[in-house]
Amino acid sequence: MSSALPDARRLDYHYIAMQTGFWAMFAAVCAYQAALLTARGFTNGEAGMLIAVRCLAGIVCQPALGSFADRHPGIPLRRIVSLSLVLSLAASLVFLLFPMGMAGTIAVLVVMGGFEISSYPLMDAMAIQFISLGVPIRYSLGRGIGSFSYAVVCIFLVTDTVHCPAHCLCHSLRS
């Protein structure tokens, strides 16, 4: 990390944008992955196995990516996180746009799980690095807005899927 500390406000905006993008991307695939898989012809058992493979890829890749980051301190965490998220986004787009068989789906879900799930602890580590250096990053605000983006994306995906206007959904939640 360089000796010049970044502007705290600018850093907050970047951190909030990163959290928002991560959780929106996570919601777009993860919240409905079982429905996506069964809609593509996989059985419930196969869908469960595929989801487990995705999670297992995250469990395996998370310590590997963290170890890589520790062994290469010259590579900023933001680059590792950015590359992880770009790879995961590309895999997510392939998954959403191109239906495929079991082998292709496993390959795409391994990339998605390995990089998307592994990037979140590194985002936390970035925030902790700045906090340790005395930069007053608003971690809780970024995390809260990220969670809000997850909820918003889920609502918009549901309203688009069931053709229900968002105000009807909000009204039913209020009742």
Identify the meaning behind each predicted range.
Residues 58-59, 137-158:
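Glycine-rich segments within core transmembrane alpha-helices of 12-TM secondary carriers
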Residues 20, 91-92, 98-120, 126:
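Hydrophobic core of transmembrane alpha-helices in multi-pass small-molecule transporters
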Residues 60-75, 161-162:
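Helix-to-loop junctions at the C-terminal end of transmembrane segments
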Residues 26, 55-62, 116, 150:
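Residue-level signal for conserved functional micro-sites within the alpha-helical transmembrane segments
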Residues 167-175:
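Symmetry-related core transmembrane helices of the 12-TM Major Facilitator Superfamily/SLC fold
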Residues 71-85:
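Cytoplasmic membrane-interface "Motif A"-like loop-to-helix N-cap segments
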Residues 2-55:
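Helix-loop boundary and gating motifs at the non-cytosolic
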Residues 127-138:
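Paired intracellular helix-loop junctions of major facilitator superfamily
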